From Swiss-Prot:
This is Cis-3,4-dihydrophenanthrene-3,4-diol dehydrogenase. GO terms for molecular function: cis-3,4-dihydrophenanthrene-3,4-diol dehydrogenase activity. Homotetramer. Substrate binds at S143. Its EC number is 1.3.1.49. The gene is phnB. InterPro entries: NAD(P)-bd_dom_sf (IPR036291), Sc_DH/Rdtase_CS (IPR020904), SDR_fam (IPR002347). Optimum pH is 9. The keyword Oxidoreductase applies. It comes from Alcaligenes faecalis.
Amino acid sequence: MAWLEGQSVFLTGGVAGLGRALVKRLVEEGANVTVLDRNARGLDELVESFKGRVAGSPGDVRNLADNRKAVELAVERFGKLDTFNRQRRHLGLLCPPCRPAGRCHQRSFDEVIGINLMGYVMGIKAAAPALVRSRGSVILTLSSSAFYAGGGGVLYTVAKHAAVGLIKQAAHELAPYVRVNGVAPGGIASDLRGPKSLGMGEQSITSVPLADLVKDIAPIGRLSDTEEYTGSYVYLASARNSAPATGVIINCDGGMGVRSVLGPASGGKGLLEKFGG
């Protein structure tokens, strides 16, 4: 039996990248999905691709009314809401350091914090009543910048660290009716863009040789595919399999937290030759 059979999921940012992969996985696991995304054309294509299983609601994740409209659509179309998944992430890797002499200003603060933090808050606020009724769950997408420095600019790293606190506080405030958890993926080769306020709206993370960089620094020795991250979301969305989990963040960083600071990134090189296989 599929893990999410008959469930209704509200997901933001599902048109491309990890969000698109997650929509596919959720449908495969038996869920119906309502997607909020600013890309109206991409949203129409997504809905057409999953006939009858996906509903689209164009809008801005920072706007409470847009989030409420998507929640209403999910309940109207699929009868209930079981999980809110805040998926869209603003690009941090290309953001310049926010030093006193750098390009950090109020507009970039509002943009990066707004998308990466207020979007979480607005989504939770809109979805909470329906989730309380269904005894559902919230799953927020973080990144390795929620735990480590150096993976993004100051604003992005601050936003992701703040989201850790948001998960813990929301888990407390919504208990015992709603579980609140997070998934922190490592590097992803998707078309995430930089802040428009810094003139980086057309810069994509695809311009960075991410696969080569991660290969050398991550203990697992490679860049993970978007599909490989989706299982963590399915696990947390399944009350049958993760009922005791709330205030939890699954850190899928490819082992960055255990890499050596003096030796090679991974300590198991040579084991294949030693043990065979």
